[in-house]
């Protein structure tokens, strides 16, 4: 190891450089099986024999390591390379965010890239590498736009959520239960459209009331290689052939996607004017904002909002009473729902972060090593060679029992007070929660907006209701949540 300093970059717990590994070197365990067939076998394990969580847990146990080699979906023929080094602990995971050592170009969704035809033929910002000048321009536009719109976040959210409560109460009254997911999807889409499209209601545009359904279809066709429908009447081999073997064509959503694009293009003049000043063509800028609003933000909220309601609902009346007291006291003192009032709600903030820890909206991160790297987990150091793919499975990394006490349990107080020091291990935004997105990284530009929306959802809920009951199940993406009862506020 005499020449290690010249050959490798050492990544420790805080991704700082060191001259020698602080932990003993260990060969990365695992294997890829027989060429081609090994990838197919692992794909079947992932989708049909084990499921995603057990797929990674079983290999972690088999190799007695949180760093190991395996194939990940989709494999042939959607992805050129299915061979990865998997990271499932909180210590090694941050290497995925160090863009000086890894490259995320083309790896937004996993080990594959959907066709640019889904985005007007453009390679949108999510797929660009940080060294690409266009990435700097586009992400800078995203960040400056969100900064400019900051004062509109709360008013637009308040406008959008009113119809959600009306729908929720009406359905509960008529049917005895209310399925939250489509109602939450409508809230998310309406808020994001109004935010970027100068306050316009999407119903009054070319998408009409079908915005969420159009985005769902558009996103599904791109993420199909990672999804299993779970239909009992469809043989596994047939579903695998259709969804996981070859890319699904854009033509299946072209007409609807054009409606979505037109609605944004005709409603965001100010943003497109600003893009032109930066040298970005109007249609390219529009496709990037459709991706930001539809794939990034709406797609994430589609998982996040039901999870948030699920965890709060199943925590019961005692947590609800504490949230009611904190929220209504702060709102009364501030004279309304304001940013300053929300900042005085540590329990609300902790509940939102704990939800993002338990159920990160984007479970997979993929990067390619730019050079030979030595990473560490809790026990050992490992060499990852240049051009190897590194794959993070976040739902295990953020439940690392050596970092979080009772890591598999939802603890609403986890990030209150001194617990805030653990926020550096919350990675849902493709970065540490304590970091802020910049033009030089791949962290979600809407990171703070998504957290604020979660906090606002909790605040608005408990301004109207004292408690509620839910039941939940699983969907293709995230949790299925159904309200069984709502108790309106008594004070």
UniProtKB/Swiss-Prot annotation:
GO biological process: defense response; fatty acid biosynthetic process; oxylipin biosynthetic process
CDD domains named in the record: CYP74
An example Gene Ontology molecular-function term: oxidoreductase activity, acting on paired donors, with incorporation or reduction of molecular oxygen
Induction annotation: Not induced in wounded or jasmonate-treated leaves.
Phylogenetic classification of the source organism: Eukaryota, Viridiplantae, Streptophyta, Embryophyta, Tracheophyta
Tissue: Expressed in roots. Not detected in aerial tissues, including cotyledons, leaves, stems and flower buds.
EC numbers, comma separated: 4.2.1.92, 5.3.99.6
Gene: AOS3
The keyword Lipid metabolism is annotated on this UniProt entry: yes
Domain of life: Eukaryota
Keywords, alphabetical: Fatty acid biosynthesis, Fatty acid metabolism, Heme, Iron, Isomerase, Lipid biosynthesis, Lipid metabolism, Lyase, Metal-binding, Oxylipin biosynthesis, Plant defense
Binding site residues for (13S)-hydroperoxy-(9Z,11E,15Z)-octadecatrienoate: 296
Positions annotated to bind heme b: 104, 135, 139, 442, 444
Protein's UniProt keywords contain Lipid biosynthesis: yes
Annotated SUPFAM superfamilies: Cytochrome P450
Functional description taken from the UniProt entry: Cytochrome P450 metabolizing both 13- and 9-hydroperoxides of linoleic and linolenic acids, but with a marked preference for 9-hydroperoxy fatty acids. Catalyzes not only the synthesis of allene oxide, but also its hydrolysis and cyclization. The first step is the synthesis of (12Z)-9,10-epoxyoctadeca-10,12-dienoic acid (9,10-EOD) and the final products are (9R)-alpha-ketol and the racemic cis-10-oxo-11-phytoenoic acid.
Record family assignment: Belongs to the cytochrome P450 family.
InterPro entries assigned to the protein according to its UniProt record, in alphabetical order: Cyt_P450, Cyt_P450_sf
The protein's required cofactors: heme b
Catalytic reaction annotation: (13S)-hydroperoxy-(9Z,11E,15Z)-octadecatrienoate = (9Z,13S,15Z)-12,13-epoxyoctadeca-9,11,15-trienoate + H2O; (13S)-hydroperoxy-(9Z,11E)-octadecadienoate = (9Z,13S)-12,13-epoxyoctadeca-9,11-dienoate + H2O; (9Z,13S,15Z)-12,13-epoxyoctadeca-9,11,15-trienoate = (9S,13S,15Z)-12-oxophyto-10,15-dienoate
Residues where (13S)-hydroperoxy-(9Z,11E)-octadecadienoate binds: 296, 302
Name this polypeptide is given: Allene oxide synthase 3
């Amino acid at each position: 190891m005499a020449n290690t300093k010249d050959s490798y970059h050492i990544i420790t717990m805080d991704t700082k450089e060191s001259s020698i590994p602080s932990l003993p070197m260990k060969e990365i365990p695992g294997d890829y099986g027989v060429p081609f067939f090994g990838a197919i076998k692992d794909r079947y394990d992932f989708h049909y024999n084990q499921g995603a969580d057990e797929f990674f847990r079983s290999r972690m146990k088999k190799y007695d390591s949180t760093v190991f080699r395996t194939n990940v979906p989709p494999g042939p023929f959607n992805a050129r390379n299915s061979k990865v080094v998997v990271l499932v602990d909180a210590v090694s995971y941050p290497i995925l965010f160090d863009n000086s050592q890894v490259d995320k170009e083309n790896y937004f969704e996993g080990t594959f890239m959907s066709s640019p035809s889904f985005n007007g033929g453009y390679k949108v910002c999510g797929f660009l590498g940080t060294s690409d000048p266009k990435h700097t321009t586009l992400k800078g536009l995203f960040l400056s736009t969100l900064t400019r719109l900051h004062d509109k976040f709360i008013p637009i959210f308040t406008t959008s959520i009113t119809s959600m409560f009306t729908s929720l109460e009406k359905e509960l009254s008529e049917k005895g239960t209310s399925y939250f997911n489509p109602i939450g999807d409508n809230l998310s889409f309406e808020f994001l459209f109004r935010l970027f499209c100068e306050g316009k209601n999407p119903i009054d545009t070319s998408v009409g009331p079908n915005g969420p359904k159009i985005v769902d279809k558009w996103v599904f066709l791109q993420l199909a290689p990672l999804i299993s429908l779970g239909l009992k009447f469809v043989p596994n081999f047939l579903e695998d052939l259709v969804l996981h073997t070859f890319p699904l064509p854009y033509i299946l959503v072209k007409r609807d996607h054009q409606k979505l694009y037109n609605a944004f293009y005709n409603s965001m003049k100010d943003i497109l004017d600003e893009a032109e000043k930066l040298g970005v063509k109007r249609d390219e800028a529009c496709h990037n904002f459709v991706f930001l609003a539809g794939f990034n933000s709406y797609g994430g909220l589609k998982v996040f909002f039901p999870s948030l309601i699920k965890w709060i609902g199943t925590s019961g009346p005692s947590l609800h009473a504490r949230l009611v007291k904190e929220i209504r006291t702060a709102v009364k003192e501030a004279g309304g729902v304001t940013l300053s009032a929300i900042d005085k709600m540590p329990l609300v903030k902790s509940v939102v972060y704990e939800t993002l820890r338990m159920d990160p909206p984007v479970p997979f991160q993929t990067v390619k090593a730019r050079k030979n790297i030595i990473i560490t987990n809790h026990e050992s150091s490992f060499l990852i060679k240049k051009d190897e793919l590194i794959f993070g499975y976040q739902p295990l990394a953020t439940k690392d029992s050596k970092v979080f006490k009772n890591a598999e349990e939802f603890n609403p107080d986890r990030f209150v007070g001194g617990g805030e020091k653990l926020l550096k291990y919350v990675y849902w935004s493709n970065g540490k929660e304590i970091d802020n997105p910049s033009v030089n990284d791949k962290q979600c530009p809407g990171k703070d907006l998504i957290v604020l929306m979660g906090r606002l959802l909790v605040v608005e809920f408990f301004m109207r209701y004292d408690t509620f009951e839910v039941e939940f199940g699983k969907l293709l993406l995230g949790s299925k949540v159904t309200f069984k009862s709502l108790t309106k506020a008594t004070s």
